[in-house]
């Protein structure tokens, strides 16, 4: 969500700060700003609504000379989108940027008004700035003590960076819930929400942990934990190449990431398939087999696209490994009383590993008596990975487009590998495990085949781009793929789309069918094909128009349009049929001229509940 970049250096940093938040645009935002303490010890602040390019224009009109400062992209949660609500916020000598939500904002605001503070915005961030200033004036303590005292009064999740004009040689960072990292330089140091903002200047990072406060100067860093004790945090060297954060020959990151899926899946499979057609996850270490041997039930918790991946895997766990599996949306999981089954393994699923609802669910689950918790994630350095008992990495590589593509298909790949691993661990049905391994081995080639069909899918997208509503249908493990197709279309084209199991058509959605609502059906050749054919006839008999993704021809009605795809093995069909739906959503959004990589109101990493 919001993006933070800060630096303390020997050079002028205004342009560096803007470059940093420019690299965080993919996180989603509606306004941006920066504040620098210049060489005359004045605070220079520039804020604007809209794209970072607007901030660049305003900054270029001023020659800002200063070596310490902070920049921010805002995604509105408290207060409308306006210049007044845009960060940084200032209270006399205190500069603050913040990501998160302060839940007792109203109470603190009322208290501070009684102390004589005047508010110029509706944000909870300005509350933090005034609270810090009040604490500083009251006790005359050092800024670190002021922050330690102030955060005790804050309810909610946050990451913040603070600069004191009276001590303009240090940045102070505090983290509770939302991610924050320190980038290590040579006689200069940096802070950011995400390493992508800093990869062009350093590959050395320290990840702040829950409750940490850090004092960051040019040559020195001191970190205090939640008990206010000085602590050393591990330095991590990033393996992400800066060039991977560029679009290359592609117009949008989403297009690039769709085409990277064969490579991403190969990376996900690499060193995990043994010569004996078994699965090995090196991340799990020596406990690898014991974890799964004792598992008698699986509970998966996720949000958004990750939830759809989890829904597919439920079919796999139950049909292939004979293990009961339940899937729940993370925000719902944390808000109700749960009955935990015996020997139940909790699995959390997240691309970023910083999804607030999923993190909250993981923390809640630790009180409930699960056998253990396993996270499947794309970011090794994430909070979810650090707080879980075990983790498996998807190895999708850097994903910048807000709409997930390769992270979804690599999640599905890992989940299917996990099914095979559980079968191996229980020493049951070894033929099924071998079949999974052998089928996954050819998946990248199958996806390369379907990417060659993109012109056919673009033609379909151009035909349907002016529609206001669409209906997606699928049966069995293709129903969650229909859900994912509808979600992708909504996210980037802003066309309303719904997904239903094909068998539910006559239980309500059939009332919507007419020539103006296209029906997108996923109907591969499998045991459910004949049932899908009956649904297609139902739609056509009511004047509906159907677009069918299948390896079979459907030419018995003039209202049927078949997007003929290559045959694919049933085990990997859900992953395979995801690709044309991603392409379809992309080309519809392209035709409509949408901002595909940064769709309105959405964020790549949802770090608030």
Swiss-Prot record:
Any Pfam family matching the protein: GATase_6
Domain SIS: 288-428, 460-599
Statement: the UniProt record of this protein carries the keyword ATP-binding: no
InterPro entries from the UniProt entry: GATase_2_dom, GFAT, GFAT_N, GlmS/AgaS_SIS, GlmS/FrlB_SIS, Ntn_hydrolases_N, SIS_dom, SIS_dom_sf
An annotated GO BP: fructose 6-phosphate metabolic process
Domain Glutamine amidotransferase type-2: 2-219
Domain of life the protein comes from: Bacteria
Keyword field contains Transferase: yes
EC number from the UniProt entry: 2.6.1.16
GO CC term, one of those recorded: cytosol
UniProt catalytic activity: D-fructose 6-phosphate + L-glutamine = D-glucosamine 6-phosphate + L-glutamate
Keywords assigned: Aminotransferase, Cytoplasm, Glutamine amidotransferase, Repeat, Transferase
Primary site of residence: cytoplasm
Catalytic machinery residues: 2 (nucleophile), 604 (for fru-6p isomerization activity)
Compartment(s) where it occurs, according to its Swiss-Prot or TrEMBL record: Cytoplasm
A GO MF term: glutamine-fructose-6-phosphate transaminase (isomerizing) activity
Quaternary state and interactors: Homodimer.
PANTHER family hit by this protein: GLUCOSAMINE--FRUCTOSE-6-PHOSPHATE AMINOTRANSFERASE, ISOMERIZING, GLUTAMINE--FRUCTOSE-6-PHOSPHATE TRANSAMINASE (ISOMERIZING)
Role according to the record: Catalyzes the first step in hexosamine metabolism, converting fructose-6P into glucosamine-6P using glutamine as a nitrogen source.
Name of the protein in its database record: Glutamine--fructose-6-phosphate aminotransferase [isomerizing]
Protein's organism: Buchnera aphidicola subsp. Acyrthosiphon pisum (strain APS)
């Amino acid at each position: 969500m919001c993006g933070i970049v800060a630096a303390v250096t020997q050079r002028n940093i205004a342009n560096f700060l803007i470059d940093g938040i420019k690299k965080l645009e993919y996180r989603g935002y509606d306004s941006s700003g920066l504040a620098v303490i210049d060489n005359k010890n004045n605070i220079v602040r520039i804020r604007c609504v809209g794209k970072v390019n607007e901030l660049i224009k305003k900054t270029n009109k001023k020659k800002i000379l200063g070596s310490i400062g902070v920049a921010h992209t805002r995604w509105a949660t408290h207060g409308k989108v306006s210049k007044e609500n845009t960060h940084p916020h200032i209270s006399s000598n205190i500069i603050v940027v913040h990501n998160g939500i302060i839940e007792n904002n109203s109470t603190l605001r009322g208290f501070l008004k009684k102390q004589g503070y005047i508010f110029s915005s509706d944000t909870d961030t300005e509350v933090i700035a005034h609270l810090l200033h009040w604490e500083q004036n009251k006790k005359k303590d050092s800024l670190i003590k002021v922050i330690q005292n102030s955060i005790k009064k804050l309810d909610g999740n946050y990451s913040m960076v603070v600069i004191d004009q009276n001590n303009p040689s240090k940045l102070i960072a505090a983290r509770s819930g939302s991610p924050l990292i320190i980038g290590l330089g040579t006689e200069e140091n940096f802070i950011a929400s995400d390493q992508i903002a800093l990869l062009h200047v350093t590959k050395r990072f320290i990840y702040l942990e829950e409750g940490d406060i850090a004092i960051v100067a040019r040559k020195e860093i001191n970190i205090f934990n939640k008990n206010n004790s000085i602590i050393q945090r591990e330095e991590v060297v990033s393996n992400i190449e800066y060039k991977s954060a560029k679009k290359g020959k592609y117009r949008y990151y989403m297009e690039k990431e769709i085409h990277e899926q064969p490579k991403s899946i190969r990376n996900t499979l690499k060193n995990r398939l043994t010569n004996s057609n078994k699965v090995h996850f090196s991340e799990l270490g020596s406990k690898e087999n014991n974890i799964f041997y004792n598992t008698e039930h699986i509970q998966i918790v996720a949000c958004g696209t990750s939830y759809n991946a989890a829904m597919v895997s439920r079919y796999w766990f139950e049909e292939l490994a004979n293990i009961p599996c339940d899937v729940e949306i993370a925000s719902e999981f944390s808000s109700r009383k749960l009955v935990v089954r015996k020997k139940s393994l909790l699995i959390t699923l997240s691309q970023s590993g910083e999804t607030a609802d999923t993190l909250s669910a993981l923390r809640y689950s630790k009180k409930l008596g699960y056998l253990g918790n396993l996270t499947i994630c794309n970011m090794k350095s994430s909070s979810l990975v650090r707080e879980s008992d075990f983790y498996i990495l998807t190895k999708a590589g850097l994903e910048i487009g807000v709409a997930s593509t390769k992270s979804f298909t690599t999640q599905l790949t890992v989940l299917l590998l996990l099914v095979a691993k559980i079968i191996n661990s229980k020493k049951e049905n070894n033929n099924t495990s071998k079949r999974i391994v052998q089928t996954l081995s050819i998946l990248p080639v199958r996806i390369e085949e379907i990417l060659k069909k993109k012109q056919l899918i673009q033609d379909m997208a151009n035909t349907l781009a002016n529609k206001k509503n669409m209906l997606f249908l699928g049966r069995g493990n293709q129903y969650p793929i229909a859900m994912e197709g509808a979600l992708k279309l909504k996210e980037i084209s802003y066309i309303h789309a719904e997904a239903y199991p094909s068998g539910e058509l006559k239980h309500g959605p059939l009332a919507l069918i007419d020539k103006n609502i296209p029906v997108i059906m996923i109907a591969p050749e499998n045991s459910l094909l004949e049932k899908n054919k009956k649904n297609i006839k139902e739609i056509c008999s009511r004047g509906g128009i159907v677009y069918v993704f299948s390896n079979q021809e459907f030419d018995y009605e003039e209202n049927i349009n078949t997007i003929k795809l290559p045959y694919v093995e049933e085990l990997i069909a859900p992953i395979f049929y995801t690709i044309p739906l991603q392409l379809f959503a992309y080309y519809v959004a392209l035709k409509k001229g949408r901002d595909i990589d940064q769709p309105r109101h959405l964020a790549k990493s949802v770090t608030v509940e």
